[in-house]
Amino acid sequence: MQKRHTDRKMYFHDLEITSKEFYVSYLSTFKKLTSKSRVLEVGCGEGGNLVPFAQLGCRVTGIDIAECRIIDAKVYFSEICENATFVCCDFMKYHAPINDEEKFDVILLHDVIEHVPAKGEFLLHLKSFLKSTGVLFVGFPAWQMPFGGHQQICRSKLCSHFPFIHLLPNSMYNSLLKLCKEEEGTISELMSIKECRTSIELFEKLIKRCEFSVVDKKFWFINPHYKQKFQLTPSLLPRFVWKIKYARNFFTTSCWYILNLSNT
């Protein structure tokens, strides 16, 4: 396990830096960000991704089911700005705004969809929070990529550094995690991620079914966040590989999608 997974303030600042350098500039290509912009992040954690948006004057809202993350987010943001709201709840039980004015211009869903069991219902609920002219940014690791199972959260050096182990059959994967003396909570989380695995093909079927339109997408060979984590230079997957279904998942460390409502 890397230090950033235990030092939450460090993790917060890492996300802030990546968001400022990559997410804001990418989103700004498709949606002008102003002091009137309403930005929502679902599964916000401590809210690091939202910092650059708040610094631009956007009104930001973060939702997370983990109370400890929301408590930290409120503490961290108290040092930065006042135009931020954080809510601890199960997003599926959070009521959507009725009026378009109360909905959001930008919604962030980063490293979240791969944890969600009922993805279709989740995306449909998310859709009800998006303004008719808004955009949804979704980022997730393709399931079959070397660390698509999030095994980097393991404490064991073997499990946290060994690629593709999440692709083992369930019984073998579970046994390996136990053999490496991973905590029950970690094993449970990793097996849940395996159950909820998200490939590019699955995600594209889901957004089509939920009637989202793809405005833009990027398949990264070297995830932009790896610049902050590992000092690696971000790199897109060669375009011809984008078109090779199934095989592309093994090389895509991060998938980015800009979506809007199909009727806009």
Feature locations, PLM:
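Conserved N-terminal segment of class I S-adenosyl-L-methionine
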Residues: 1-102, 106, 123, 252-257, ...
